């Protein structure tokens, strides 16, 4: 006889991360190609001296550093820290949604939203995208008296698009004040062209807005799992109540603080990624691909029924990309030589179609 598990888990998929294949070019996980700065490495080395001790469960120094980084309108009480922003997504579901409640988000979007909602016994309301972008009008129309939480993934993963600052502000104004709006900004550092929203201003103006950010992408600490939320102190207190103790390591906290100290240098690296993004996008379009304008560190190829063939042939060429069913393929913008190899493959594949 096996243990009796919750029956609703039977229908949940197991998360499948981007593959790592020895010797292959990995363009599947939106990782930065830049390693930690020397100052961050030094902080990591120092932190190893105390790994026999539990980490600071309250992340006191990191929260203080984040508050300083965010500006004078924010205090540590406005900040929650988690084991990556994905953990904070789950915590937000936990503190807002009960059995039968609804959580609204565009689809396709971050693939862990649906299972996180279902594990809570709540109902995911997946609103189709328009032109690969969140349709905020349709999302607003999907709000009911059972809606407890709305996710706006901006830039959207995996389609790379953003909703404009004005449209996002109007949406926030229109959502009832008792519904929490989570603006998931894992890739916000890559937004250009005047499309970056004043999300922190929305937090200041609306008690029901929380912003999620991460050190995994632009800051290059994906392996240390550090994310944070910015919101009203009542929301932050609720997140802290469901935080699993000690899940943010002492090494991660030290690395994050050192990264904030070097933020200007680290964020300057995003200009290199953005330049490569423009080059890769232009060359893909010149080769005959259709793709939306990216504001992230990846591009989206809506290949439909040809998705699996593209992925398999890329693997044969020792290039690993990320498929999303029969919707399309997400491709990380990587180092120039890696991007060149991908572009050579993409042109060959396109010429055979």
Swiss-Prot record:
Enzyme class: transferase
Any Pfam family hit: Aminotran_1_2
Residues with the N6-(pyridoxal phosphate)lysine modification: 217
Keyword Protein biosynthesis in annotation: no
Cofactor requirements of the protein: pyridoxal 5'-phosphate
Its job: Aminotransferase that catalyzes the conversion of aromatic amino acids and 2-oxoglutarate into corresponding aromatic oxo acids and L-glutamate.
Protein name listed in UniProt: Aromatic amino acid aminotransferase
């Amino acid at each position: 006889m096996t243990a009796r598990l919750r029956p609703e888990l039977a229908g949940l998929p197991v998360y499948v991360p981007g593959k790592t294949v020895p010797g292959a070019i990995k363009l599947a996980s939106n990782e930065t190609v830049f390693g930690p700065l020397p100052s961050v490495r030094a902080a990591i080395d120092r932190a190893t001296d105390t790994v026999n001790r539990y980490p600071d469960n309250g992340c006191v120094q990191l929260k203080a550093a984040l508050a300083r980084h965010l500006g004078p309108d924010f205090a540590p009480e406005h900040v929650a820290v988690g084991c990556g922003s994905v953990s904070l997504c789950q915590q937000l579901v936990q503190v807002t949604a009960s059995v039968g409640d609804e959580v609204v988000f565009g689809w396709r979007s971050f693939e862990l939203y649906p299972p996180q909602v279902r594990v809570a016994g709540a109902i995911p309301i997946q609103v189709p995208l328009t032109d690969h972008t969140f349709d905020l009008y349709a999302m607003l129309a999907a709000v009911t008296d059972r809606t407890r939480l709305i996710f706006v993934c901006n830039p959207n993963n995996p389609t790379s698009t953003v909703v404009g600052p004005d449209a996002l502000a109007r949406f926030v104004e229109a959502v009832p004040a008792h519904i929490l709006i989570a603006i998931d900004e894992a890739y916000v550092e890559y937004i250009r062209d005047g499309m970056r929203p004043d999300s922190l201003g929305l937090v200041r103006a609306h008690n029901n807005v929380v912003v999620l950010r991460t050190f995994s992408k632009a800051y290059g600490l994906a392996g240390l799992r550090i994310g944070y939320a910015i919101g009203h102190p009542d929301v932050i207190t609720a997140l802290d109540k469901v935080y699993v103790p000690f899940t943010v390591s002492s090494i991660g906290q030290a690395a994050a603080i050192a990264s904030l100290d070097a933020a200007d240098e680290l964020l300057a690296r995003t200009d290199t990624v953005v330049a490569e993004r423009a080059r890769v996008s232009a060359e893909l379009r010149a080769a005959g691909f259709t793709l939306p304008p990216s504001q992230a560190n990846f591009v989206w190829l809506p290949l439909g029924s040809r998705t699996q063939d593209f992925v398999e042939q890329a693997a044969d060429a020792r290039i690993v990309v990320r498929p999303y069913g029969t919707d399309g393929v997400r491709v990380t913008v990587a180092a120039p030589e890696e991007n060149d190899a991908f572009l050579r493959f993409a042109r060959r594949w396109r010429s055979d179609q």
